[in-house]
Amino acid sequence: MCREDWSASIRRRPVRQAVTSDPRARRIRRALLARGSWSETNRVTEILRKETVGGIILLVAAAAALIWANSPWSQSYFALRDFELGGEWLGLHLNLTLGAWAADGLLAIFFLVVGLELKREFVAGDLRDPSRAALPIAAAVGGMVVPALIFVLVNLNTGDGALRGWAIPTATDIAFAVAVLAVISTHLPSALRTFLLTLAVVDDLLAITVIAVFYTDDIKAWALALAVVPLALFTVCAQRGVQKWWLLVPLSVATWVLVHESGVHATVAGVLLGFAVPVHRSATRRGQQVDHAERVGMAEYFEHRVRPISAGIAIPVFAFFAAGVSIGGLSGLSRALGDPITLGIVLGLVAGKPIGILVTTRVLSAVTRASLDSSLRWVDVLGMSMLAGIGFTVSLLIGDLAFGMGSERDEFVKIGVLSGSLLAASLAAIVLLTRNRAYRRIHREETADDDHDGVPDVYQTRQD
């Protein structure tokens, strides 16, 4: 390619990476957090729109739980949370409290969506491209390691099993995060929205791995082996495009029950079921046209139907039962905030997450000699890393697993997660609002459609 053609292509795509025939040079010059394709931007926007609604419902549910747990009627809240429902049938132990049903059962729906997202990202999303996947994966790992190290350092001499909570400040709650973005009304650029979502997806993968490996005690091999049967049948049905819920739901429930009985946390069943669903589907099968659900892929079909249940019911109900903590006034709050476990969680979320994500991103930039996209600044990455410090749903779940629901340390975990998440959200809002004028300008560029063809002009140079 001649110099004039090369320069012209750069002028046509002012915020894209430089084009060169040398693959090694292409990797070197690739911009970090570059704008994605129109189809990918549309998909991310739709997901975050649903998560925003779910995040607002989550905040309302958590606030209601806090108010009730600290009211004169607090005993009725804890009685409701600890009310046992279920029984033991065929040797299966399903006599759980309502709080446990929410944590083990409803969150499995959330992790089913996580599994679908992960499958979609690795097969058809940003994570399928190693050069684009490197940043969110590295950032997620950094955002997990540093908060965990901070928690361990703070609690190194605490003793009595305090270090079991090392993973609590490592999670990111995407629903809470996008609810914060909705409240502050910032016009976040598409590249940052995609980065936040992909980071959260990888973060969820790391979280479920941690839960399965570090918070599983005794395993019943027979139950785990039996769980393979309904999971395999579910996989066959999904691969064949079966959409009959009267068949899929019982298979899903059977998988969940057996995984729960095995000793592995039942939410792992949700991820496995999500992984079983195919992303792509041919437009024809045996020479015949298939319907829209199969044509777009069963993963998208499942996600469109399950995500509203996850965001609107499963996560808010879990938050309602998990966030209720009796603070005990200013003296109780002061005592809780002075506890090493609470302090380790707050520091991990507020300081550890931003440090881990930002430093990892800077190191990746230096190692690959890739500069940040020209429309963005490093303060934008700082704002995103602070927003990732909102660790609510999964952090509360890990706290329950580490110290036991209702224990004194579990109460400290809740105060630490709530305090750390609110502080991280406030700091992120301050940083992002300082850039809102630039975000509005980028938003105008990303939505301008002078030729009125339905695709913003800035995406016209990309092949979707």
Swiss-Prot record:
Reactions accelerated catalytically: Na(+)(in) + 2 H(+)(out) = Na(+)(out) + 2 H(+)(in)
Keyword Nucleotide-binding among record annotations: no
Organism taxonomic ancestry: Bacteria, Bacillati, Actinomycetota, Actinomycetes, Mycobacteriales
GO cellular component: plasma membrane
Residue ranges crossing the lipid bilayer per the database entry: 53-73, 96-116, 134-154, 165-185, 195-215, 219-239, 257-277, 313-333, 340-360, 378-398, 412-432
Highest taxon, organism lineage: Bacteria
Cited function: Na(+)/H(+) antiporter that extrudes sodium in exchange for external protons.
Protein family: Belongs to the NhaA Na(+)/H(+) (TC 2.A.33) antiporter family.
Protein localization: Cell membrane
GO molecular function: sodium:proton antiporter activity
Protein name, UniProt field: Na(+)/H(+) antiporter NhaA 2
PANTHER family according to UniProt: NA(+)_H(+) ANTIPORTER NHAA, SODIUM ION/PROTON ANTIPORTER NHAA-RELATED
GO BP term, pick one: regulation of pH
Pfam families (UniProt xref): Na_H_antiport_1 (PF06965)
Annotated gene: nhaA2
Annotated membrane topology: Multi-pass membrane protein
UniProt keyword annotation of Membrane present: yes
Alphabetical UniProt keywords: Antiport, Cell membrane, Ion transport, Membrane, Sodium, Sodium transport, Transmembrane, Transmembrane helix, Transport
